[in-house]
């Protein structure tokens, strides 16, 4: 058996235990995809990232849940870039590129007003697709009633790299009542049975935030809930622009994680382009600890 060093970071917060955890394996030389999957399962976080050399970008990042590989993960990207930058493993410039299975994506690095590193990541082109399943069954899968869903806003699938089902909820208090039946999601999400589920609303705990959300995992991922979700927050920006406020430029704050003891914040920028919108998410990260797993 091999002993693999894993670094535990939390993204979208600078306060330990308040962000979204990700495992980072910096020395992944010689690992097979089967090895990476075993490591992700042993680590047990929603995502574990494996930075690798790239011939097309400054770094290639692979993302694994405990159950399978995914194309892109926002919080694990933030954590990986933070780790590489603070260890001097990235080029000494403010703009870099990363290779992912969602494409080549630009990353911008800056120093925030409190001297913390801010990482801005362009998302893949947003896609929104209709949901034709049962709204009542969907609500029941979250231990809600159909009347908790917003009547004037649509339920749609969305992606800026990873597909999720965006579910507009009327009131903030419904989020404390949610008890997801993840195993039932594929039956309801017939168009995309492997998608995750992302309820959100326009009421927030923080008056400076624009949207509140929770994120429930696909049962195939091996996890139940994601504390603070970058890619889903990005596509929420595209949803907001299409269905709520179609301004040429939007600066949004998404809050997530309160119901499970987290307190994450994700900055989402939406910019109109000629025939689409550009989505960027911004956040930071903090190192928690190092540990080892054996495979």
Curated annotation (Swiss-Prot):
Keyword set, alphabetical order: Isomerase
Alphabetical list of Gene3D superfamilies matching this protein: Diaminopimelate Epimerase, Chain A, domain 1 (3.10.310.10)
Top-tier EC class: isomerase
InterPro entries found in the cross-reference section: Phenazine_PhzF-like
E.C. number: 5.1.-.-
Alphabetical list of Pfam families matching this protein: PhzC-PhzF
GO cellular component assignments: cytoplasm
Lineage: superkingdom: Bacteria
Any single GO BP term: biosynthetic process
Residues annotated as catalytic: 47
Family the entry assigns: Belongs to the PhzF family.
Cited PANTHER family: PHENAZINE BIOSYNTHESIS PROTEIN, PHENAZINE BIOSYNTHESIS-LIKE DOMAIN-CONTAINING PROTEIN
Name this protein carries in UniProt: Uncharacterized isomerase BH1950
Source species of the chain: Halalkalibacterium halodurans (strain ATCC BAA-125 / DSM 18197 / FERM 7344 / JCM 9153 / C-125) (Bacillus halodurans)
């Amino acid at each position: 058996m091999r002993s693999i060093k894993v670094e535990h970071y939390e993204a979208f917060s600078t306060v330990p235990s308040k962000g979204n955890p990700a495992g980072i394996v910096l020395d992944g030389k010689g690992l097979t995809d089967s090895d990476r999957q075993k490591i992700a399962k042993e680590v047990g976080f929603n995502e574990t990232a494996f930075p690798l050399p790239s011939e097309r970008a400054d770094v290639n990042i692979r993302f694994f849940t405990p159950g399978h590989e995914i194309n892109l993960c926002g919080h694990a990207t933030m954590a990986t870039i933070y780790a590489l930058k603070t260890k001097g493993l990235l080029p000494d410039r403010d703009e870099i590129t990363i290779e992912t299975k969602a494409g080549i994506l630009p990353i911008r690095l800056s120093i925030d007003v409190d001297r913390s590193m801010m990482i801005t990541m362009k998302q893949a082109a947003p896609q929104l697709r209709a949901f034709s399943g049962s709204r009542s069954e969907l609500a029941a899968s979250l231990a809600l009633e159909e009347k908790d869903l917003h009547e004037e806003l649509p339920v749609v699938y969305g992606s800026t790299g990873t597909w999720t089902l965006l579910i507009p909820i009327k009131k903030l208090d419904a989020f404390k009542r949610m008890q997801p039946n993840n195993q039932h999601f594929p039956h309801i999400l017939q168009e995309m049975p492997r998608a995750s589920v992302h309820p959100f609303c326009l009421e927030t705990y923080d008056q400076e935030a624009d949207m509140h959300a929770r994120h429930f995992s696909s049962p195939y991922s091996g996890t139940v809930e994601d504390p603070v979700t970058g890619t889903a927050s990005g596509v929420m920006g595209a949803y907001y622009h299409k269905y709520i406020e179609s301004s040429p430029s939007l600066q949004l704050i998404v809050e997530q994680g309160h119901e499970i003891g987290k307190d994450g914040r994700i900055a989402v920028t939406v910019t109109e382009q000629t025939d689409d919108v550009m989505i960027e998410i911004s956040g930071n990260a903090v190192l928690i600890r190092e540990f080892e797993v054996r495979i």
